[in-house]
Amino acid sequence: MSGGLDILSLKEDDITKMLVATTHLGSENVNFQMEQYVFKRRADGVNIINLGKTWEKLVLAARAIVAIENASDVFVISSRPIGQRAVLKFAKYTDTTPIAGRFTPGAFTNQIQPAFREPRLLVVTDPNTDHQPIMEASYVNIPVIAFTNTDSPLRYIDIAIPCNNKSPHSIGLMWWLLAREVLRLRGTISRTTEWPVVVDLFFYRDPEEAEKEEAAAAKELLPPPKIEEAVDHPVEETTNWADEVAAETVGGVEDWNEDTVKTSWGSDGQF
């Protein structure tokens, strides 16, 4: 929580980013435990999330993450593809442990399997899709931080950060803001300077679109084809070969009519 400190309060630039990323847009349904985070309901049925409370809970979550002595004991999880890139980037900059993709059942409870882990804190992208690690964390008393929408269940969740967790841009921005706040509380970066890591790195990218963009970028880097100038070669004058070479006679006979034609194969003219 900001505790009324101006240095921890929500800045106008961050509010603009949230509005552009549609972080304030919830779903049409509301869980009774999420009603406290709903600002109002639009005419089309979409619930608007109070961004002031979103920021307060995000600061509280960052303080909980910083309180863990060993950063690798904090596990960040995302089963949905739109949050996997953000989870990997968050783990890269905060030295936490990512689990992107399918979660192995029993990783927190079954001690005999090779994938067994003992985290001290979980941060999940969506309580609906990440219900398996949340359930296992409740068995072994692991606190859970979750990005929750207006219709998300809050069972076994200790810190809920209300936001739009269905939009790729919104979930990427929330992970970026959480990573920046963690680094600020650790003293790694200053609050007076801008974090050089752009938020675009946390956004989900479609593999097909990424391949097209990379191919287009590689095509632009290729040097332009060299165009060779045409060289004028002297053209030799053609000569009439018929004038220089006389026509050869066949069989030494100039006139075919003068050649004697045999009428029989015998010497006496008989066949």
Curated annotation (Swiss-Prot):
NCBIfam families: uS2_euk_arch
Species name: Drosophila mojavensis
Protein name: Small ribosomal subunit protein uS2
Alphabetical list of Pfam families matching this protein: 40S_SA_C (PF16122), Ribosomal_S2 (PF00318)
Location of the region described as Disordered in the Swiss-Prot/TrEMBL record: 249-271
Keyword Nucleus: yes
Family per similarity comment: Belongs to the universal ribosomal protein uS2 family.
CC terms in the record's Gene Ontology section: cytosolic small ribosomal subunit; nucleus
Purpose of the protein: Required for the assembly and/or stability of the 40S ribosomal subunit. Required for the processing of the 20S rRNA-precursor to mature 18S rRNA in a late step of the maturation of 40S ribosomal subunits. Required during oogenesis and imaginal development.
Residue stretches of biased makeup (Polar residues): 262-271
Keywords: Cytoplasm, Developmental protein, Nucleus, Ribonucleoprotein, Ribosomal protein
Gene name as annotated: sta
CDD domains, alphabetized: RPS2
Subunit structure: Component of the small ribosomal subunit. Mature ribosomes consist of a small (40S) and a large (60S) subunit. The 40S subunit contains about 33 different proteins and 1 molecule of RNA (18S). The 60S subunit contains about 49 different proteins and 3 molecules of RNA (28S, 5.8S and 5S). Interacts with oho23B/rpS21.
SUPFAM superfamilies: Ribosomal protein S2 (SSF52313)
InterPro entries to which the protein is assigned, alphabetical: Ribosomal_uS2 (IPR001865), Ribosomal_uS2_C (IPR032281), Ribosomal_uS2_CS (IPR018130), Ribosomal_uS2_euk (IPR027498), Ribosomal_uS2_euk/arc (IPR005707), Ribosomal_uS2_flav_dom_sf (IPR023591)
GO biological process: ribosomal small subunit assembly; translation
Location within or outside the cell: Cytoplasm; Nucleus
GO molecular function, one term: ribosome binding
